[in-house]
Amino acid sequence: MKKYIVIAVVLALLVPSLAMAATEFSLGGFIKLDAMWDSNSAVGKNLNALPARNNNYDNNHGRLKFTAQGSRFNFTIKGPQLWGAQVTGFLEMDFDAAENGLTSGVAAGTQGVAFAGASKSYTPRLRHAMFRFNWPTSELLFGQYWSMFCEYYVETAEDGPFQMTGTPTARLPQIRFTQKFLGDWTVAALVGDPNQVTLPTAATGPYNAAINNGQSAESPQVQGKVTYAHDWWGKAAYYGKPTPFTAQVVGGWQRNVTRQQNFALNTLGNNINGTGAVVENALSANAGFYSQNQYVNPWMVMGSLFIPVIPTSSANLAGTAHILTNWWIGQGVEAFGFGAVTSNLYKFMNNFNNLWYYEAQLLKKFGGMAEAQYYFNNQWFLNAAYGVSKAYGVSRARFLRGASVFGLNNMEWGMGDNAQTIQQVAVTLWYRPIQAIKFGLQYEYAAAHYFQYVLPAGGAAGIPPVANTANRSNFGSDHRVEFVGFFYF
């Protein structure tokens, strides 16, 4: 009996070994060094945070930074055949999780050892973890992978370039189906994890603040795309790969939940910036109660064009040029990976018993980017790009406390310190002597026009050094010079 048990255990151990024998692994990735100087120290490593206003003395002294945290590695796994499809997997990690408290989504004070320590021990993070079934014209994907909005980036030196203007950066757990037809057309759809939207900080929006307010709405994020690609007159390089004329449209939607907010009459006061107290589930002489759910619906539509201007019909890229452009419109666009949305809106809707009721509204934005690239030869090429994003549909009327609150519908209570217009310009000279080595030297300019004018802060008590309108500002800018080196493996 003991012999049969031993044989059974050995056979059980052999089953996964036999399955693994049909699997092939390949290692890929790159080692990257970034060296940069910024005139405005409020921007993140990836230029995904707004530059501070030019009258902010704390952030306009410059910053010099060297980092290798953009390095990454990945495994491509070729698995067995199943249902007539080839099964493959992809797992990728990098070290770009936390930089210095200024990276989008990373709170100040949580930067850890990497910021202040002598040994820059950045924490690894998961980028992609997915597997897929590939048939000749179809693909079914499961796992964490790129959003459909993230397929066309400008080729600049920073990671996730133009996150504030041209292309969002988002990777979400998803189920995606892709179908090719008629040779040149591709359609795809996904359902995935909904993302957080940025509600005003003075309001407790979700029922459980520790839970993503997209997940609280219990609806997935959905995306769909249509792509047309055809070699009409030749190809040009996109990240070094010969690519034909391509046109693409992507759309996305999700739902987020919050509570309709009511505010205490005796705490809001004459505050135009929206820092009054929020009253929830409280009844008193000066407080109200409103228990209705409110749903907000982030959505975005993006159109992309890749145009070979000076094409090639071979792998020789010398003398080739392209134009790439993305243009988009939406609301709550941070749910799809755009940065620099500091808050969404609360608008005064009505009043009851002289109490003030406010309703959340998502910030509406549009924007885009355009890139031109030219290859002098197969080693040297030049890249120039411009991106812009703009908030629209924002009333500048602010609700002030008064004897009566009737007739003031749609005036805003608070919208955070949002930028009305963001612009980015980058010029990058690239040198790639061999496929494994790539160097870049870049100048980039970023500028933000804010809705609000702010006086400069100074002193321990935060008193402006000269409290007059001459010192106020609604504009911030950053000049960056960056060198980058890659070793691909």
Task: List PLM regions with ranges.
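Outer membrane beta-barrel
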Residues: 22-47, 53, 57-200, 216-236, ...
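Outer-membrane beta-barrel "beta-signal"
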Residues: 224, 475-489
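Detector for outer-membrane/organellar transmembrane beta-barrel domains
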Residues: 224, 238-423, 427
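Aromatic- and glycine-enriched pocket-lining scaffold segments that form the walls
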Residues: 159-299
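Bacterial N-terminal signal peptides
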Residues: 8-16
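Short sequence motifs at beta-strands and strand-loop junctions characteristic
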Residues: 62-68, 121-123, 167-169, 214-219, ...
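Outer-membrane beta-barrel strand-turn architecture
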Residues: 77-83, 134-137, 181-183, 230-232, ...
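Flexible, surface-exposed loop regions and adjacent strand-edge segments
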Residues: 44-49, 106-110, 158-161, 204-208, ...
